[in-house]
Amino acid sequence: MSTRDLSVLISVVLIVAMLVIPFPPWLLSILIIINISLALIVLLTTMNMQEALQFSIFPSLLLLLTLFRLGLNVSTTRSILSHGEGGKVVETFGNFVVGGNVLVGLVVFIILIIIQFIVITKGAERVSEVAARFTLDAMPGKQMSIDADLNAGMITEQEAKHRREKVAREADFYGAMDGASKFVKGDAIAGIIIVMINIIFGIVIGMLQQGMSIQEAASHFTMLTVGDGIVSQIPALLISTATGIVVTRAASEGNLGHDITGQLFAYPKLLYVAAATIMLLGIFTPIGILLTGPLAGLLAFGAYTLSKSGKEKEEVDEILEEEAEVDELKSPESVVQLLHIDPIEFEFGYGLIPLADANQGGDLLDRIVMIRRQLALELGLVIPVVRIRDNIALQPNEYRLKIKGNEVAKGELLLDHYLAMSPTPEDDLIEGIETVEPSFGLPAKWISEAVKDEADMLGYTVVDPASVVSTHITEKIKQHAHELIGRQETKQLIDHLKESYPVLVEEVTPNPLSVGDIQKVLAKLLKEKVSIRNLVTIFETLADYGKLTTDSDLLTEYTRQALAKQITAQFAKENEVLKVVTCSGRVEKAIADGVQQTEHGNYLSLEPDISESIVRSVAKEAEQLSLRQETAILLCSPPVRMYVKQLLERYFPDLPVLSYNELEANVEVQSIGVVDI
C-alpha cells in the first residue's frame, strides 16, 4: 500500500475518532485551520480546472470533507459544553471577527446560513439534478455521434474508445454529484441545529453545573457557539461555492479565471458604455464624481487597452496564418498526405446531403455502422471505416462508392420518392419514374408518397432511398470484400485468433505458411462469397495441408471442402431439394485435359472454340433458370471445380460453382440442367 493510500485511510480513521474521543482545544484549533485550508484548496482547484472530469474525485471528497466538518462540530460542541472553551480559533472568531457582540455574531451567522443554504446550496442541488438527467438522456446521442465519426473516418478506433469511456465517466460523475449535493444541503441544516443546541444546552449547563447567572451563561456560551458556527460555516460556504462551480462548469480550453476575463471583457465598446454610465451617475446624483470618477476612468482605460491589444492580436494571427499556409505548401508532408487512399469511400451530390445529416433526419451514418457490423458477422471480415463526403463534381442526386480509389458502384436517388419493385416485371399498375434497382438490376419505379400505400396493396416492394443506397453499399462491399483483406488485415485476424488458439496459429504460421499465403486463401474464399468467420476450421485445414503444399489454389479447395457444412447451409434450404446445373463428362474431361502444370502452379488452357461452347451452354442454362425465377448453381467434380470457376468468372461473376465434396451427404440434389459441349 502506497503512502498516499495510507494517509487517506489514517485521515478517515481520525475523522471517525473525532466523533467519540475528546480532543484538547489546541488540537481542535489545528484541525479547524486544516479544515479552512482544505476548503480553500478545493475552491481554488475547481476554479482552475477546464472541465468537470478533471476533478472527478470531487463527489467522494465532498463526502469526506462534510464528515470532517461534522466531526469538528461534534468535538468543539463537546469541548464547549464540557470545559467552557473551544480553542483559540473559536474564541478569536467569537470575539475578534464579530467584535465581541453576540447579536452581531448571530446576525453574521444567520446571513452565512442564508447565503449557503438558500442561495448556493439550493442552486447547486438543482443544477446537479438537471445536469445528471440531461447527461444520462444525452448518452445514446453521444454514443451514436462517436460511432458516426468513427464510421466517417474522422477518428480512430482508439479515439472512439477514449470518447466512449469519457461519456461513461461523465454519466457516473454527474450521477454522483446529484447525490453528493445532498451532503452540502444536509451540512447546512446540521449547522443550524448544532448552533441552537449549543446555545440552549450551554445556558443550562452554565447555570446548573458551573453556577453562572443566566446573563453570564448566555453571553459566554453564545459567544463560543457563534464563533464555532462561523468557523465551521466559512469552509462550508467555500465548499458549497466549489460545488456550484463544478456542476455549472462547461468544458473549455481555459480555467474559470481565463474564461471569465476572456468572455466578460470580450467587447471593449461595452466597457466605454459602462464607464459613461458610471460617470453620469456621479454627475447627476448626490453620490458625487469623486467616488464614480476613478472607477469610470479605470473602465475607460481598460476598454482602450483591450481594444488596442485585440487589434494587435488580429494582425499577429493573420500574419501567422499566412506563414502557416506558406509553410504547409512548402512542406513535403502536405504532398505525402495526398498519397493516402481510403479503403472505402462513399461520395454523394449536394442534393443527397440530408441522407447523412442527422439534423435533417438522415440516418445514413447509423446505417453504415450497422452494415459494418452485419458484414463482420456475415463475412468474418472487419470492414474498414467508410469515408463519407459530399462531392460537388457529382450531380445533385448522384452517389458513388469507391474501393481503394476505384469506382465500383454508382447510382441516383430521389429523396422525396420511394423505389417500388413489382413481383411481376411486366405489371404496370402504378405511375412513376422508370429506373433500375441498383443492387440487383431489377426494373423498378420511383413513386411519390401519395401512391405508396396503393403500391403496398398491389404487392409492390416499396423501399425508401436510405434503404436503397444501404443495400447497394452492402452488396458491393460483399462483392469486393476480397480486395479489402490484405496482409495487415490478415495479421490482425491471426493475432485475434492467437489469443484463443495459440498452438493452432503457431503450427500454421510463420512456418509452413507465411501471412501472405494465408491472405491469398482468405481472399479467394471471400471472392466466392464464402465467409471466413470460422477461422478455427480454416486454420485446422491449413495446418493439415500446409505441410504438403503452399499452392493457394489447392489450399483454398481443401479449405472449401472442410467448410462443407457452412457452404451447404449457404445454398441449400433445410428439408428442400437443392436444384443445380451439372457439368457433363465431356466438359469435365476437356477441362481436366486443358490443365497445364508448371513449376509455378497449374493453369487452364483450352481451345477457344471449346471455351466458347462451354460459356454458351452455361448462358443458356442460366437464362432458362432466370425465366423460372430459380437460382443458378453449377455443380462439378472436385478436381475441376476451381478451373471451371476461373473459366466462367469473367462472364458470370456471381455464379456459384460448387463441387460434390462441398455439400453434405444428407443434402438431396436434383439436376435441372446440364452444361455440355
Swiss-Prot record:
Q: What are the protein's UniProt keywords?
A: Bacterial flagellum biogenesis, Bacterial flagellum protein export, Cell membrane, Membrane, Protein transport, Transmembrane, Transmembrane helix, Transport
Q: Name one Pfam family in it.
A: FHIPEP
UniProt main location, coarse: membrane
GO annotation terms (biological process): bacterial-type flagellum assembly; bacterial-type flagellum-dependent swarming motility; protein secretion
Name the membrane topology term. Multi-pass membrane protein
Record's Gene3D superfamilies? FHIPEP family, domain 1, FHIPEP family, domain 3, FHIPEP family, domain 4
Annotated membrane-spanning segments are: 6-22, 27-43, 52-68, 104-120, 189-205, 230-246, 275-291
GO CC annotation terms, alphabetical = plasma membrane
Enumerate the PANTHER family for this protein.
Answer: FLAGELLAR BIOSYNTHESIS PROTEIN FLHA-RELATED, FLAGELLAR EXPORT PROTEIN, MEMBRANE FLHA SUBUNIT-RELATED
Family the entry assigns: Belongs to the FHIPEP (flagella/HR/invasion proteins export pore) family.
Task: Relate the protein's function as given in its record.
Answer: Involved in the export of flagellum proteins.
Write down what this protein is called. Flagellar biosynthesis protein FlhA
